[in-house]
């Protein structure tokens, strides 16, 4: 068994700790600011903002063409040839942002987004003016895709300091601006203020940090890189679309059957439940390039199995602390007491996010073997199950029923990922023996 000292000397662990320390500061500060926003916004406003934020985040996972998987893979393959690497970066960025501009124009011409939001607005317990939020929701979507593209570029290029600087500056500038304006505003729509200030500021910061990326590109479009990226990424975009039934469907059913005030509490619980997933992502950001670059399959499997056990144990323990801490914060009125309902369904949401982390972890195998169509098939099955469970549980059991449903779905998907990933690596090991 490895000693604690030898673990700390491992280069992957050391880089993880370096990135994790910044993430702890950034994410920790964002979570510490949750009570500030809870007191600056009404429960209804907090619910509407959370709903719009999750809608934009879900759309970003659908419209990003799966670059978060294609970019690290192609970067490693082209890293030894600077011109190939530079043209690959240019090809992926032009393809992604050209596609995004086309989709934005299409939505503005057809008004398809209005048809979606009218479903929620027909509910008696939900009322908000989507028309006023629309321009800033599109900016938020563009900013999310832009910032994640930069993040995965920095990860692929192993520019850890760039990630740290970007995250720290974004945290300070965006939060200071938003909190100041919300505090000074009295009768203004606080959902609109928070949405607009946060993502206009973030988008401008992305433009500043994109300078280091622009310096690396070579303006030569390569069709072969575009096709490779689409082969890897398009199944993931489809997975994002299908997964939206599970990952955004819970918020949609909460808004439809419980209203925007209940969505405020559910949004708070969902934010707290993402902590285990965020902790995992700090590790995965550093682990992924090393995972994709490992040539010895037996070593890869051994490391992967060991890390999976550690991740599961750490995240379950962390979840217990989060639930207990949330209970204390409610008792001390740091979280307003009208959010007390979260203690009943937060455990299930935490469990669902622990297994969501494992889903992402085992997804690395499908990227490694370029078998990203497998998660696509699994996601379709999960979406059908999710819609069925939400439909049966939402009206009768509310948030408790929905949170239990999403936990069951994520556990089932994790088990399928483990089965298929082990099948492929065992098959490849036998073929190379």
PLM segments and residue spans:
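Interhelical loop/hinge segments that connect adjacent transmembrane helices in multipass membrane
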Residues: 1-13, 118-129, 161, 188-195, ...
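Hydrophobic alpha-helical transmembrane segments
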Residues: 51, 135, 164-213, 381-385, ...
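Helix-loop junctions and terminal segments of transmembrane helices
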Residues: 63-80, 273-298, 367-368
């Amino acid at each position: 068994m490895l000693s604690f000292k030898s673990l700390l000397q491992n280069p992957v662990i050391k880089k993880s700790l370096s990135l994790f320390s910044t993430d702890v500061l950034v994410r920790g500060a964002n979570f510490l600011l949750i009570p500030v926003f809870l007191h600056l916004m009404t429960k209804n406003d907090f619910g509407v903002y959370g709903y719009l934020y999750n809608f934009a985040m879900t759309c970003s996972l659908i419209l990003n063409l799966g670059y978060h998987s294609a970019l690290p893979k192609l970067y490693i393959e082209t890293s030894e040839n600077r011109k190939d690497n530079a043209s690959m970066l240019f090809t992926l960025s032009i393809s992604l942002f050209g596609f995004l501009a086309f989709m934005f124009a299409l939505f503005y011409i057809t008004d398809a987004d209005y048809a979606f939001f009218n479903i929620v607005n027909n509910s008696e317990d939900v009322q908000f003016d989507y028309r006023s939020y629309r321009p800033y929701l599109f900016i938020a979507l563009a900013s999310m895709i832009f910032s994640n593209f930069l993040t995965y570029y920095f990860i692929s290029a192993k520019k850890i300091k760039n990630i740290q600087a970007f995250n720290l500056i974004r945290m300070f500038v965006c939060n200071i601006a938003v909190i100041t304006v919300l505090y000074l505003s009295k009768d203004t729509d606080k959902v609109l203020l928070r949405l607009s200030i946060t993502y206009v500021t973030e988008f401008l910061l992305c433009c500043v940090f994109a300078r280091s990326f622009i310096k690396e590109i070579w303006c030569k479009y390569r069709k072969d890189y575009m096709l490779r990226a689409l082969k890897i990424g398009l199944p993931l975009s489809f997975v994002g679309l299908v997964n939206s039934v599970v990952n955004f469907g819970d918020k949609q059913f909460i808004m439809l059957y419980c209203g925007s005030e209940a969505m405020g509490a559910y949004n708070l619980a969902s934010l707290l439940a993402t902590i285990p997933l965020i902790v995992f992502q700090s590790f995965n950001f550093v682990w992924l390039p090393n995972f994709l670059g490992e040539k010895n399959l037996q070593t890869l499997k051994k490391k992967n199995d060991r890390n999976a056990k550690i991740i599961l144990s750490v995240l379950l323990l962390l979840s217990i602390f989060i639930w207990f801490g949330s209970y204390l914060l409610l008792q001390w009125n740091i979280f307003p007491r009208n959010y007390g309902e979260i203690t009943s369904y937060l455990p299930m949401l935490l469990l669902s996010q622990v297994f969501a982390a494992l889903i992402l972890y085992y997804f690395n195998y499908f990227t490694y073997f370029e078998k990203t169509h497998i998660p696509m098939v699994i996601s379709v099955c999960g979406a059908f199950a999710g819609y069925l469970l939400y439909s049966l549980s939402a009206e009768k059991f509310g948030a408790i029923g929905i949170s239990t449903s999403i936990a069951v779905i994520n556990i089932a998907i994790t088990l399928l990922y483990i089965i298929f990933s082990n099948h492929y690596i065992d098959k490849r090991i036998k073929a190379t023996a």
